[in-house]
Curated annotation (Swiss-Prot):
One MF term in the entry's GO annotations: carbohydrate binding
Intrachain S-S bonds: C29-C44, C38-C50, C43-C57, C61-C66, C72-C87, C81-C93, C86-C100, C104-C109, C115-C130, C124-C136, C129-C143, C147-C152, C158-C173, C167-C179, C172-C186, C190-C195
Name of the molecule in the record: Agglutinin isolectin 1
InterPro entries registered for this protein in UniProt: Chitin-bd_1, Chitin-binding_1_CS, Endochitinase-like_sf
Amino acid sequence: MKMMSTRALALGAAAVLAFAAATAQAQRCGEQGSNMECPNNLCCSQYGYCGMGGDYCGKGCQNGACWTSKRCGSQAGGATCTNNQCCSQYGYCGFGAEYCGAGCQGGPCRADIKCGSQAGGKLCPNNLCCSQWGFCGLGSEFCGGGCQSGACSTDKPCGKDAGGRVCTNNYCCSKWGSCGIGPGYCGAGCQSGGCDGVFAEAITANSTLLQE
């Protein structure tokens, strides 16, 4: 009886995990998902799916850590930023001092969070980028050249063709050797990270990596 009970619990737990993974993979957003936003600054692709990497954050990205900063504020007819991002004094959406500091027009204005090699290798929370100067944020100043981790605007090489390099933030290394989150990265052929399509752990981890 005890063995059957243990087996039933194990099967139940497996079913819950499978359901969570399927839910994460199928998460819809943007115009195709009732204008929902993705959690933890994951990008909403042009096709309305949440993830991270070029397929999600590149061309057509609707919200989240898109590689092209959205316009906002007085320079964009009073438009506001999605994902609770700051609108800088120059009318661009993002996170960090350049966006949330002096002249910030809207959003959670706050101080910088340190990260990267300048902070003992700490990662930023919620998929924020760690700039070359060691501060967390979103936008070209953080996710562009020299970006150390997070939603960097260039897919970082990984896997067997990159000397066995693993992705930061527990992102998946796809079969093509690039880092990201989503079925195309964590599914068939995934080399490391939250593989086998179960990338919900990677999403959750990024919400608790570093607290202010």
